[in-house]
Amino acid sequence: MTITPQHLIALLPLLIVGLTVVVVMLSIAWRRNHFLNATLSVIGLNAALVSLWFVGQAGAMDVTPLMRVDGFAMLYTGLVQVASLATCTFAYPWLEGYNDNQEEFYLLVLIASLGGILLANANHLAALFLGIELISLPLFGLIGYAFRQKRSLEASIKYTILSAAASSFLLFGMALVYAQSGNLSFEALGKSLGDGMLHEPLLLAGFGLMIVGLGFKLSLVPFHLWTPDVYQGAPAPVSTFLATASKIAIFGVVMRLFLYAPVGDSEAVRVVLGIIAFASIIFGNLMALSQTNIKRLLGYSSISHLGYLLVALIALQSGEMSMEAVGVYLAGYLFSSLGAFGVVSLMSSPFRGPDADSLYSYRGLFWHRPVLAAVMTVMMLSLAGIPMTLGFIGKFYVLAVGVQASLWWLVAAVVVGSAIGLYYYLRVAVSLYLHAPQQPGRDAPTNWQYSAGGIVVLISALLVLVLGVWPQPLISLVQLAMPLM
């Protein structure tokens, strides 16, 4: 096939981030300068975000059999870029106090963000696998970036070994699917599945293995065991990326796969996914109840959030509404997580060994950093799904979709899970307003709201509140972002 200028415009975000990777690499080789490399990375990611406008003008198309650029791809590319940008801005003050090599951090974030864009555009199992590897491999390095901290190194090794195992499951599952159907492209798979092939044992085994691999990457129960340890061990800016960008990109591609290849039509697959969703919601919330470490708590809560999203995925066959639900929910989850992890990153910057992640570090934060405490409170309320925040709109959508598809037991799980979640989110929020301990352990810098990370956190809080009261702009955007059928 010939690549036309139209195709190049459609690939702009991918090309810009790829170019930024090369530029940052050369810049590191030329001269180590933390500020320069951070600025280059942020400029590149911003340019990729702006280029989405030109992509939208070019219209939807297939660029190579592996990639399809349409509204859906643009929405998820945008979300991944926002998460990567936030990660870079949170990382800058954190790395200022870090004595080993600082610049490679941005390189790894950029490469992972490249994987995220590839996943958002993937239209083929090969692209899906490449994207997942591109997003996972840099994460091995990022999680262990503070490698002189025992926890960080341990988290990196755990994630690396388990991730390699999960990837092999995923690959073997794809091989079985290919052996049975002879296709790897999502749409061709959809056509061959339409011929009543969904009852073939080989095909079901293939999809089962793929669910194991993808379930690990999305940290769904029972493949979630790495999540709390890795969230706790990884540096705070990395936990931000792990909780947002990698989850959003992978969920986006799974969504597209289920849309084109109606795997959900198989009763067996639906039951398995239903059980996984149910277990993730209940288990994630119950385990978060007893946590005294904020990053572990957010790790367990991310398991339950992915469970809620899975409810919308199972209801995908029942109409357009669940695409909308996932888009709105992910946007709410993105901004709430960016805000929550952003506060942890600001409290932990500059690097001085372990992060400020114990709940005790946040006691009485309100009395000396009132705005930061207010932001953290808003994020906790949004994650809990309290009305007037964006988190509520997303949860409401998921419930509506569940009711529409009459998945009553999952709707019940979402309601019960949200009730349990309320307790531990409010526990974090309340501790911000208690009496401050005599000698506060860690504190955010005095002028935090003027730093790039502080601005990102404040914008996230604003978006969560404004879109929570008036969600129409977001809903319209998500409705525009429909995949090319």
From Swiss-Prot:
What processes does the entry annotate via GO biological process terms?
ATP synthesis coupled electron transport
Q: Note whether Cell inner membrane occurs among the keywords.
A: yes
Q: Which GO terms describe its cellular component?
A: plasma membrane
GO function terms (MF aspect): NADH dehydrogenase (ubiquinone) activity; NADH:ubiquinone reductase (non-electrogenic) activity; quinone binding
Task: Tell me the enzyme class.
Answer: translocase
Show the stretches that span the lipid bilayer: 8-28, 35-55, 71-91, 105-125, 127-147, 159-179, 203-223, 235-255, 271-291, 297-317, 326-346, 373-393, 408-430, 455-475
Membrane-topology annotation of the record: Multi-pass membrane protein
Family matches, as InterPro entries? NADH-Q_OxRdtase_suN/2, ND/Mrp_TM
What compartments host this protein?
A: Cell inner membrane
- One family from Pfam that matches here is Proton_antipo_M
E.C. numbers: 7.1.1.-
| UniProt catalytic activity | a quinone + NADH + 5 H(+)(in) = a quinol + NAD(+) + 4 H(+)(out)
On subunit structure and binding partners, the annotation says: NDH-1 is composed of 13 different subunits. Subunits NuoA, H, J, K, L, M, N constitute the membrane sector of the complex.
Into which family does the record put it?
Belongs to the complex I subunit 2 family.
- State the NCBIfam families in the record: NDH_I_N (TIGR01770), PRK05777.1-1 (NF004439)
Role played: NDH-1 shuttles electrons from NADH, via FMN and iron-sulfur (Fe-S) centers, to quinones in the respiratory chain. The immediate electron acceptor for the enzyme in this species is believed to be ubiquinone. Couples the redox reaction to proton translocation (for every two electrons transferred, four hydrogen ions are translocated across the cytoplasmic membrane), and thus conserves the redox energy in a proton gradient.
Protein's name according to its UniProt entry: NADH-quinone oxidoreductase subunit N
Species of the source: Salmonella gallinarum (strain 287/91 / NCTC 13346)
Upper classification of the source organism reads:
Bacteria, Pseudomonadati, Pseudomonadota, Gammaproteobacteria, Enterobacterales
